[in-house]
From Swiss-Prot:
GO terms for molecular function: urocanate hydratase activity. NAD(+) binds at residues 53-54, 131, 177-179, 197, 202, 243-244, 264-268, 274-275, 323, 493. It catalyses: 4-imidazolone-5-propanoate = trans-urocanate + H2O. This is Urocanate hydratase. InterPro entries: Urocanase, Urocanase-like, Urocanase_C, Urocanase_central_sf, Urocanase_CS, Urocanase_N, Urocanase_Rossmann-like, Urocanase_sf. It is found in: Cytoplasm. One of its GO terms (biological process) is L-histidine catabolic process to glutamate and formate. The active site is at residue 411. It is an enzyme of class 4 (lyase). It comes from Pseudomonas aeruginosa (strain LESB58). HAMAP family: HutU. Pfam families: Urocanase (PF01175), Urocanase_C (PF17392), Urocanase_N (PF17391).
């Protein structure tokens, strides 16, 4: 028996156009989106199957990838493929309205849900870290997080700077698949940004894709640029090669005062995602193989230094927030007792949106034709004519966001509007206005699909932060509603032991049957978010549930 391979020197791109390589669009869609996750324009390290987020993979190994592709090409429209941590393990007869693929990634019994145990399983070829959209085949590059980051910066600007970020700057770190959205999001929100990254290859990736505007040669140069651009009122993003655990304390020592501080390094995974201060990347990767315990310790010690600097900025009155990478938890475990003194971004800025089921609705054009996305942009504006903020986002996205892989769009909308848009897109496919079917999905970071006490469900007003029934119910309901593929993951965003979350994707192929599935899925999916927040006592969610006619027996029947 040959050893499974996690490396292959190959370039993968999803097919374009209308010629099927599978038996129907319901199986062609997951096939193309799996391949799109590994497109070199999309993935961070596609030759090792890594899509984003440390070691977030699309398949467990290359042999599993090959078999998934072969199986999808042969799958019938009354069969369902089961994928267990990136490995295709079974095909079963179901029915036409069942999902074509069901995916479970990285799930561990809670007592064993640690990085140490997961890494043992991973080394034996028994598990795969799916992050959120890596192992669920609906990653669309950094655009997938741009609008959420933009909405966060805009809301922070409203709360702290009267809604005007002109002449202000954001300090952050991490330019990977998620963090790479920060510089563009800050620019779109009207602010300058200084973005620290320890790998030159990632800076090059963001410069190429126009997510970051320019690179400074050193810290002094970066600060000079920040001073010049903020004085001129320009929103320019600057990348700086370096280590945040070294640069942030130096900025504190110098008395430099940003206008906002956050972080999107891959701190959730100390073994693979956070470079210890004073180490080279090569040393880090080598020692991860030979002495993983020492690497984890060194990384977490550096995170503690990093968080202490963030706390120092907060104590100066600078708005400072965690952007969901669990760095506060890591620092607390290294003795920073007050690591949670600064809030996470969801309770600080995003939760009111979640209460109305508003979250990261996204779609991709299976044709590969950008015009299909531009036509859907226009349709969104037509169907939501009075939302100037949304229109501005779509205009900025078209102007500034480069497509990575298959053309795609992210657009935060909520209960009611998601189904309305999905049905309209399906009709555009039916009429031939779009040249091929569209897939609609979302991040697992959504209002009803995640339990993550250090991120999406931090500081719930009823104390239900760690209750993970909700993402399980979300996955079950999306399966019953007829989503094309459904995923249930553990550990995304914040690492092993700290989150459970689910995802769904639905195909708009222009058929009447698709319209029925779309209406169910795109109503029920955001509906679970409103339900979850209404159950926690949020009045905004309770009001939304009543307005939208949700049947919540313990709430809408009584209040």
């Amino acid at each position: 028996m040959t050893t499974p391979s996690k490396f292959r020197d190959i370039e993968i791109r999803a097919p374009r156009g209308t010629t099927l390589t599978a038996k129907s669009w319901l199986t062609e869609a997951p096939l193309r989106m799996l391949m799109n996750n590994l497109d070199p324009e999309v993935a961070e390290n596609p030759r090792e199957l890594v899509v984003y987020g440390g070691i977030g993979r699309a398949a467990r190994n290359w042999e599993c990838y090959d078999r998934i592709v072969e199986t999808l090409k042969q799958l019938n429209d009354d069969e369902t493929l089961l994928v267990q941590s990136g490995k295709p393990v079974g095909v079963f007869k179901t029915h036409a309205n069942a999902p074509r693929v069901l995916i479970a990634n990285s799930n561990l019994v809670p007592h064993w849900a640690t990085w140490e145990h997961f890494n043992e399983l991973d080394a034996k070829g028994l598990a795969m870290y799916g992050q959120m959209t890596a192992g669920s085949w609906i990653y669309i590059g950094s655009q997938g997080i741009v609008q959420g980051t933009y909405e966060t910066f805009v809301e922070a600007g409203r709360q702290h700077y009267d809604g005007n970020l002109k002449g202000r700057w954001v300090l952050t770190a991490g330019l990977g698949g998620m963090g790479g959205a920060q510089p563009l999001a800050a620019t779109l929100a009207g602010a300058c940004s200084l973005n620290i990254e320890c790998q030159q290859s990632r800076i090059d990736f963001r410069l190429r894709s126009r997510y970051v505007d320019e690179q400074a040669k050193d810290l002094d140069d970066a600060l000079a640029r920040i001073q010049r651009y903020t004085a001129e009122g320009k929103a320019i993003s600057i990348a700086l090669l370096g280590n945040a655990a070294e640069i942030l304390p130096e900025l504190v020592r110098r008395g430099v005062r940003p206008d906002m501080v956050t972080d999107q390094t891959s701190a959730h995974d100390p073994l693979n995602g956070y470079l210890p201060a004073g180490w080279s990347w090569e040393e880090y990767r080598d020692r991860a193989q030979t002495d993983p315990a020492a690497v984890v310790k060194a990384a977490k010690q550096s995170m503690a230094v990093h968080v202490r600097a963030m706390l120092a900025f907060q104590q100066q009155g600078v708005p400072t927030f965690d952007y969901g990478n669990n760095i506060r938890q890591m620092a607390k475990e290294e003795g920073v007792a007050n690591a949670f003194d600064f809030p996470g971004f969801v309770p600080a800025y995003i939760r009111p949106l979640f209460c109305r089921g508003i979250g990261p609705f996204r779609w991709a054009a299976l044709s590969g034709d950008p015009q299909d996305i531009y036509k859907t942009d226009a349709k969104v504006k037509q169907l939501i004519p009075d939302d100037a903020h949304l229109h501005r986002w779509l205009d900025m996205a078209r102007e500034r966001i480069s497509f990575q892989g298959l053309p795609a769009r992210i657009c935060w909308v909520g209960l009611g509007l998601r189904a309305k848009l999905g049905l309209a897109f399906n009709e555009m496919v039916r009429s031939g206005e779009l040249s091929a079917p569209i897939v609609i999905g979302r991040d697992h970071l959504d209002s009803g699909s995640v339990a993550s006490p250090n991120r999406e469900t931090e500081a719930m007003q009823d104390g239900s932060d760690a209750v993970s029934d909700w993402p399980l119910l979300n996955a079950l309901l999306n399966t019953a509603s007829g989503a094309t593929w459904v995923s249930l993951h553990h550990g995304g965003g914040v690492g092993m032991g700290f989150s459970q979350h689910s995802g769904m994707v639905i195909v708009c192929d222009g058929s009447d049957e698709a319209a029925e599935r779309i209406a169910r899925v795109l109503t029920n999916d955001p509906g679970t978010g409103v339900m979850r927040h209404a159950d926690a006592g949020y009045q905004v969610a309770i009001d939304c549930a009543k307005e939208q006619g949700l049947n919540l027996p313990m709430i809408t029947a009584q209040r």
